[in-house]
């Protein structure tokens, strides 16, 4: 993979993770982060430049979807789950 293409993929990976961590819902947040990591690990050995570009374009579309869903989730936020409350003492 060319250096510029590698930098582009890493930048896209970081942007997707960063944006996914903004989901207000715990389940969406953990699923999105896990799915992004799995997808990038699955495709880390791809060498064909055409296939890499196809995957990058798909990831850019997915990043747009994540941004849109994060925004919608913030409009209709819900209470935090018990698992998210770290201030509560454990018994």
From Swiss-Prot:
Which source organism does the UniProt entry give?
A: Homo sapiens (Human)
Instruction: Give, as in the UniProt entry, the pathway in which the protein acts.
Output: Cofactor biosynthesis; iron-sulfur cluster biosynthesis
PANTHER family (alphabetical): LYR MOTIF-CONTAINING PROTEIN 4 (PTHR13166:SF7), PROTEIN C6ORF149 (PTHR13166)
Assembly: Homodimer. Component of the mitochondrial core iron-sulfur cluster (ISC) complex composed of NFS1, LYRM4, NDUFAB1, ISCU, FXN, and FDX2; this complex is a heterohexamer containing two copies of each monomer. Component of the cyteine desulfurase complex composed of NFS1, LYRM4 and NDUFAB1; this complex contributes to the stability and cysteine desulfurase activity of NFS1. Interacts with FXN; this interaction is nickel-dependent. Forms a complex with the cytoplasmic form of NFS1; this complex increases the stability and cysteine desulfurase activity of NFS1. Interacts with NFS1.
Task: Give Gene Ontology CC terms.
Answer: iron-sulfur cluster assembly complex; L-cysteine desulfurase complex; mitochondrial [2Fe-2S] assembly complex; mitochondrial matrix; mitochondrion; nuclear body; nucleus
Record's family?
Answer: Belongs to the complex I LYR family.
Any Pfam family from its record, for instance, is: Complex1_LYR
Report where it is expressed, by tissue: Reduced mRNA levels in Friedreich ataxia patients.
- Localization, UniProt: Mitochondrion; Nucleus
Q: Which CDD domains match?
A: Complex1_LYR_LYRM4 (cd20264)
What does the UniProt function comment say about this protein?
A: Stabilizing factor, of the core iron-sulfur cluster (ISC) assembly complex, that regulates, in association with NDUFAB1, the stability and the cysteine desulfurase activity of NFS1 and participates in the [2Fe-2S] clusters assembly on the scaffolding protein ISCU. The core iron-sulfur cluster (ISC) assembly complex is involved in the de novo synthesis of a [2Fe-2S] cluster, the first step of the mitochondrial iron-sulfur protein biogenesis.
Residues the record lists as N6-succinyllysine modifications: 47
The name of this protein is: LYR motif-containing protein 4
Coiled-coil stretches are none
Q: Name one GO biological process term.
A: [4Fe-4S] cluster assembly
Transmembrane portions of the chain: none
Under Gene Ontology molecular function, one entry of this record is: structural molecule activity
Q: Which residues bind pantetheine 4'-phosphate?
A: 6, 44
| Disease involvement | Combined oxidative phosphorylation deficiency 19: A mitochondrial disorder characterized by respiratory distress, hypotonia, and severe lactic acidosis in the newborn period. Other features include gastroesophageal reflux and elevated liver enzymes with normal synthetic function.
Which domain of life does this protein belong to? Eukaryota
Q: Which UniProt keywords are listed?
A: Disease variant, Mitochondrion, Nucleus, Primary mitochondrial disease
């Amino acid at each position: 993979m060319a250096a510029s293409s590698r930098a582009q993929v890493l930048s896209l990976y970081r942007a997707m993770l960063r944006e996914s961590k903004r989901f207000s819902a715990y389940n969406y947040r953990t699923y999105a982060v896990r799915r992004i990591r799995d997808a990038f690990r699955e495709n880390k050995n791809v060498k064909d430049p055409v296939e890499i570009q196809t995957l990058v374009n798909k990831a850019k579309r997915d990043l747009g979807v994540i941004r849109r869903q994060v925004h919608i989730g913030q409009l209709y936020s819900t209470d935090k789950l018990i698992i998210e409350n770290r201030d509560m003492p454990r018994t």
